Each structure stands twice: as structure tokens, then as C-alpha cells.
Amino acid sequence: MDLPAEALDWLAVWRDVRGLVLAGDLGLPRRLTAAGHTLFALTDDLTLAGRLGSLEKVTPLVARPEAIPADPCQFEVAFAHQNLHRFDLTQALPQLARVLRPGGCLSASYLVRDDTVPWVRRLSALLRRYDPMAMRGDYGHASLEVLAASKYFSDVEERAFRVWQRIGRDDLLSLVTSQPLAANLAPEQLGQLLGQVGELYDGAVRPGESLRLPFQLLGVRAWVDHAELTAPVQPPDSALSIPL
């Protein structure tokens, strides 16, 4: 699902940034370079690194954020979308702080389903009759709280963007069939469940239209504080270095 342009601009902060992206796929790097930004894309997946290298204005770095192979103060913005929780943040956050320029920020985001819409609440309640853990997605966005509490990022801004995905009747039935609970149901039970889901859809949608599945993009801009680094970052006029 594409990020809204407004959200992308907010996460990027400025135009034409020199950025570091913790790459999980090609999606975010493509969007950022299309917006005019120049990127270094960090991944430990050699196959993905090769694909990233084919993109214009993207330089792949084969590494993890716990040990970034870059001099200090190299980037204005570091980006992490849907993957910050996959890393050891006790090591990754000071590394990211080290390679950010003074005044730079780490922009992290997660796309999570919004269960406050009435038809989605009814769907959740229906599925939980069959499996109490249904639709309790763990997206990893608790890592944003870890970032907000980090001493390496003293000022944190938060913002949420609403994102809608159109979903047809067959799409919703396929979505339910793909849930783990479906594999544990007898054919008769699954048929009964799908019938109830179909009735729910028909009762919620307007004639000739499709439903919209709501999501929220949770965004954080965490501004770097170099004062907390063990080895203070002091970029001289002619070069960038960390005095030991």
C-alpha cells in the first residue's frame, strides 16, 4: 500500500535530502527518489541490495543498522518504515544518531489497521467468536515508543495519517480465508463463517460501491542529540570524523 504524499513529505522534512533508508523492499526507496531525494539503502539481504542498486539515486550498503559502515554526520534524514522493531535498538539507535548530521532526524513509520470504524469492529467481533486472537495484529509499532524514549533523540514529533484501501466482497472473503483461524476450522465451520462475513459486507456497503478498509500511518520524527554519544561527533570544516 502506497504512503500518502503528504506523509512522505512530512517524514522527509526537507526537499532533496541526502538520506539513509533501512530498506525492507523497493517501495520506500522508489517513492523517496521519485520525490527527488538521494539515498543510501541499508540492507543485509544481498538479493535486495542488488535490486536496490538498479534504482537511480540509490547506493546500497550491505550491513545492518547496528553497525553502519559510514562516517559520522553523513545524512540529513534516516528512514525506517515498518521495520524498526526488527533491529537491536540498543545498538542501532546510537549508530543512527552517529551518522545523522546535527539537526537531522530519524523518521520512522508504521502502517496499522484502524479498528475504530464500525464495520471493522463488527468483523473483529465476528472472527473472535472463532478465534479470540483474530485481528490482533502485532505490527511492531511499539518500537516507536522505544525511539521516543531514547536519549540519542531528545525531541520527538508524532503524527498520524489516515489511509483507506478499497476492498470488494470477494477481497474480504479472501482476506478472511487467509487468516490463521481459517486453517483450524472444519469445512462446515469455515463455510458458515464466510456466509456471515458476506452478510456483514452486504449490510455495510452502499449499492454499487465497495467498502474501504481503514489504516493509520503512525509517523515519528526524532531529532538527533549528539551530546549523548560516548564519542562526541565533531565534524570539522574539511572532513567528518569522530575524535576518540
Residue ranges of predicted features:
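Conserved catalytic/acceptor-binding region of the Class I
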Residues: 97, 101-167
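Conserved Class I S-adenosyl-L-methionine
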Residues: 148-244
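A generic alpha-to-beta junction signature in SAM-dependent methyltransferases
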Residues: 13-15, 33, 99-100
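A short beta-strand submotif of the Rossmann-like class I SAM-dependent methyltransferase core
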Residues: 77-81, 89
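Conserved alpha-helix/loop element of class I SAM-dependent methyltransferases that forms part
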Residues: 1-18, 25-27
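A short, conserved alpha-helix within the catalytic core of class I
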Residues: 86-96
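A short acidic, Gly/Pro-enriched loop at the edge of an enzyme's catalytic core
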Residues: 66-78
